UniProtKB/Swiss-Prot annotation:
It holds the Pfam family Gp23. It comes from Vibrio phage KVP40 (isolate Vibrio parahaemolyticus/Japan/Matsuzaki/1991). This is Capsid vertex protein. One of its GO terms (cellular component) is viral capsid. Keywords: Capsid protein, Late protein, Virion.
Length: 298
């Protein structure tokens, strides 16, 4: 735990080290940006007409899309004097660091899941069989793996993750064949499938999708573009800010994280530079073939 000597605040580097591993990077591609407008690029194979040569013809298209970088802000009402008193008493500031990082990560992850579910293709509802919760968990575990295989048939990319809301997360993680990843809300099945918890879901559902790592390139339904203001630190997407409480005139401290969420152009007629309004991804509902969402009857 480090503390800034200049203002008594938790060192922002410490906040970032706590923050970045909590973000659901298992379900999104990452293309960092240094600009206030995040631009992402993608290649797409395009079949061409048969020219009679006996060779299957394929071309490639480069797509470019962009979105405005937005901000997540989190402030603490704890005053500088309180922080200094905590230090004098030997109380660790890690409580504040963890709280700020956890809450910002939570807000970013909520945005990621909401955007992903908005653009995913809606599949047929699933009904679980079994007389016990354990049997239902086993049935759901089988069904999400079948859904992952179905994605491979249409895209060539096998599903790598499932986002689970409501009771579905408990069923999947309670079936005895998963292990938690670090301190995050992510588990990994023995099969390699990542299981991500949508803890704010108001219904039972699963979204199965692809995040495929191809070295320098990644394939997924959604692109997460963190704004890297500090190139000296990996994952430097957050910075401190200082304001003033209008009522007490006391200093107010907090952290701002800046990032963008974008999706690739999903229609063949979307060419050139396509602007994505990530605050209204519902306009692209039911359009991504790299992720499918299913309502679940438990």
């Amino acid at each position: 735990m480090t503390v800034s000597n200049s203002n008594g605040l938790p060192d922002i580097v410490t906040v970032q080290k706590r923050l970045y591993p909590l973000i659901f990077t298992e379900i999104v591609s990452e293309q960092p940006t240094k600009q206030p407008v995040a631009t992402a690029y993608g290649f797409k194979a395009v079949p061409e007409a048969d020219d009679g040569s006996g060779w299957t013809q394929f071309g490639f298209r480069l797509d470019r899309w962009y979105a405005q970088v937005e901000s997540s802000k989190m402030k603490t009402e704890i005053s500088l004097e309180t922080l200094q008193d905590m230090q004098a008493l030997g109380v660790s500031n890690s409580v504040i660091v963890d709280s700020l990082a956890d809450q910002i990560a939570d807000e970013i992850n909520t945005s990621i899941i909401g955007a992903l579910n908005s653009i995913s293709t809606v599949g047929a509802a699933l009904t679980l069989t079994g007389n016990t919760d354990f049997e239902k968990g086993q049935d759901l575990y089988t069904k999400v793996h079948l859904a992952a295989s179905e994605i491979e048939k249409t895209t060539g990319c096998k599903g790598t993750y499932v986002v689970a809301g409501g009771k579905c997360f408990g069923y999947l993680t309670g079936c005895g064949v998963v292990q938690r990843v670090g301190e995050s809300d992510v588990y990994k099945a023995w099969s390699g499938l990542y299981i991500v918890h949508d803890k704010y879901a108001t219904s039972d559902y699963v979204t199965v999708g692809v995040k495929k790592d191809m070295g320098d390139y990644e394939i997924s339904s959604l692109v997460f573009s963190p704004y890297q203001f500090d190139q000296a630190n990996d994952g430097a997407i957050a910075y401190q800010y200082k304001g003033t409480d209008p009522k007490s005139f006391h200093p107010v401290y907090g952290v701002i994280a800046r990032y963008a969420l974008t999706v690739p152009p999903l229609e063949d007629n979307q060419t050139g530079a396509v602007e994505i309004d990530w605050s209204n991804l519902g306009a692209l509902a039911n359009s991504s073939k790299l992720s499918y969402t299913y309502a679940v009857t438990v």
